[in-house]
Amino acid sequence: MIILNYNKTFFLKSISNISDIQIEHGIEIAFIGYSNSGKSSAINALTNQKKLARFSKTPGRTQLINLFQVTSDFRIVDLPGYGYAKAPLLIKIKWQNMIYSYLKNSRSLKGLVLLMDIRYPLKILDQDIISMALNCKIPILLLLTKCDKFTINNQKIQFQKVYEKLDKFLNELHIQLFSSLKKIGIEKLKSKLNFWYEKYR
């Protein structure tokens, strides 16, 4: 298997609309999740760069899409966090339409990393994203983030609950525990991204 050096990942650009990516070559893996799911922390942990993905002081405030270059033909797409309660309804609708259009129409998107706080998994919008991705034949890696908040035993219990709810989708969806703080699951995340890169490039 190809082993990529994620430490060399660099910021490419920010855009306000997914149609502005305007890059036809290579493959993309998108990171998506609620505003407080630990998305930025996961990208920083993956790349071993503390400030690559910037944190917003107000969750959900940033509506920009951030692109990061891993190799010349492999990009990470950091989609805006969703579910921010104070976001205007029109913004929420626009976001949902944009995401569905991206999942359905992007030729470069080959995988989706969906991040969920292990304490509050499978909220309504998480389930919507899973349905959208599966309908569009996009494979999913589901990270149960902040697992360090639980004891090892409770991690296993929560993992099993999520596993059972998604049991019928496990051919297209993989679930794993993750903690940016304790460095849990980072190597498995790299392995999955390497697998997608080798399979689809």
Swiss-Prot record:
Keyword Cell division: yes
GO molecular function: GTP binding; metal ion binding
Binding site for GTP: 33-40, 60-64, 78-81, 145-148, 178-180
GO biological process, one term: division septum assembly
Names of the cofactor(s): Mg(2+)
InterPro entries assigned: G_ENGB_dom (IPR030393), GTP-bd (IPR006073), GTP-bd_ribosome_bio_YsxC (IPR019987), P-loop_NTPase (IPR027417)
Binding site for Mg(2+): S40, T62
Keywords: Cell cycle, Cell division, GTP-binding, Magnesium, Metal-binding, Nucleotide-binding, Septation
One Gene Ontology term, aspect cellular component: cytosol
Keyword Magnesium on entry: yes
Domain EngB-type G as annotated: residue spans: 25-199
Cited CDD domains: YihA_EngB
Function according to Swiss-Prot or TrEMBL: Necessary for normal cell division and for the maintenance of normal septation.
Family (UniProt): Belongs to the TRAFAC class TrmE-Era-EngA-EngB-Septin-like GTPase superfamily. EngB GTPase family.
Protein name: Probable GTP-binding protein EngB
Originating organism: Buchnera aphidicola subsp. Schizaphis graminum (strain Sg)
